[in-house]
Amino acid sequence: MKHTEGFLKIVEDAKTRVREVDVPHTLERLKTGARLIDVREDNEWERGHARGAEHMGRGVIERDIETAIPDHSTELILYCGGGYRSALAADNLQRMGYTNVYSMAGGWKAWKDAAAPIEGE
């Protein structure tokens, strides 16, 4: 998908405040209790997702996160299709007071390219 200039501008702005991690780092952090959150749309999730991930779409994560994960110090790693929407969501969660939030660089594409475990595909 080709992204618009305006969208890329807000993503780049968010990325100045958001820490990114790669797939190998994500896999290591999951072993120690980090929570992996897929922020893609429902139809994307249903076509396949990272094994063990939780689904909270980009349109509802800010509304639902505090009920699902009330501890603002929980380590959260967010991913989307390519790392753009997850950066925006991570930025918002930080603004909500979550202190240990990351965006997975490259998103679902990077996860699949790394042959990391998947389910639902």
Where are these regions (language model features)?
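Rhodanese-like catalytic fold shared by cysteine-dependent sulfurtransferases
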Residues: 1-35, 42-75, 82-121
